[in-house]
Design a protein with these regions (language model features):
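Catalytic Walker B motif of ABC-type/P-loop ATPase nucleotide-binding domains
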Residues: 148-152
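ABC transporter nucleotide-binding domain
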Residues: 166-256
Length: 300
């Protein structure tokens, strides 16, 4: 659907996006992850024609992405802005007229779609940040695009606003069969909605795979919560000959081998006088995968 080939962006002599080969398939909720400064926003701006690439190509269904095709993409880059003295409905009506959208019923249709029909006559300055984000999504959807590009849409929202925005994005993809490309550094939320993940680091796309593949690559481990992590580490290594473990924080160790025999491990720790507060089999999170991927790249 949307694909880039060796996309580069240089500002003076600084390369902020390097040899980017991004591929978004129809129906994806594609999570573009990266720390602040990784090149995510610059990438989205290039995809939308707001920033000209230094080199490389952008394709839409195998054809060069040209100005007429941008009408098939809706977007929010940074925080959506509205006229504060106008109501939610008036802001959308103004956008409808300026965009040449003929259907007058579109305003209420999309306010209802994002759950803001009861706030239609509230002024924009009275809306919460989460409500403004949903209003921005409504505005981006009014011309019925095939794809929605969202830059950090949950950044700065409170927990309720994050939940509402996440559920809205998932609902739009399911009911409208729209493709979504969403950038974020909040990994836990992307984990709850994305079907495909790309990880950017220092301007490069270092990973791109289906979320199911990430789950297959994630490691299983035995999480030990104990009263003395130092004594536990010594016992694991010297007596049980287990060396693939990580002391995560005070009172917690992750064991990546031998955890199938968790009963014997627990028994030996107790015999040694170590209090085992909790012992559970866990799986790496998306955050763990992200840290491993970016750390490997820095060490390479």
């Amino acid at each position: 659907m949307l694909q880039t080939h060796q996309l580069n962006k240089l500002y003076r002599k600084s390369c902020v996006v390097e040899n980017l080969n991004l591929r978004v398939e129809p129906g994806d909720i594609y999570g573009l992850l990266g720390q602040n400064g990784a090149g995510k926003t610059t990438t989205l701006r290039m995809l939308l024609g707001l920033v000209k690439p230094t080199s490389g190509q952008i394709e839409w269904y195998g054809h060069a992405l040209t100005r007429p095709l941008y009408g098939r993409i809706g977007s929010i880059i940074e925080t959506p802005g509205f006229y504060p003295q106008l109501t939610a409905a008036e802001n959308l009506e103004l956008h409808r007229r300026m965009s040449g959208i003929p259907e007058k019923g579109t305003v209420m249709e999309y306010l209802k779609l994002v759950g803001l029909e009861k706030a239609a006559h509230r002024k924009a300055k009275q809306l919460s940040l989460g409500m403004k984000q949903r209003l921005g999504i409504a505005r981006a959807m009014m011309h019925r695009p095939d794809m929605l590009i969202l830059d950090e849409p949950i950044n700065g929202l409170d927990p309720l606003g994050i939940k509402e925005t996440r559920e809205l994005i998932v609902d739009l993809q399911r009911k409208r069969e729209i493709t979504v490309l969403i950038s974020s550094h909040i990994l836990g939320e992307i984990q709850l909605m994305a079907s495909r993940i790309g990880i950017m680091h220092q301007g490069r796309l270092i990973e791109q795979l289906d979320y199911e593949d990430i789950q297959g690559k994630n490691r299983h481990y035995l999480e030990l919560k104990i009263d003395d992590e130092k004594r536990t580490a010594v016992l694991l290594e010297r007596e049980l000959h287990l060396t693939n473990f990580q002391v995560c924080e005070q009172g917690m160790i992750r064991l990546y081998e031998g955890f199938q025999d968790s009963g014997a491990i627990n028994r030996r720790l107790v015999e040694a006088g170590i209090e085992v507060k909790e012992l559970t089999i866990q799986t790496d999170s998306l955050e763990d995968f992200f840290i491993r991927a970016t750390t490997r790249k820095e060490l390479a």
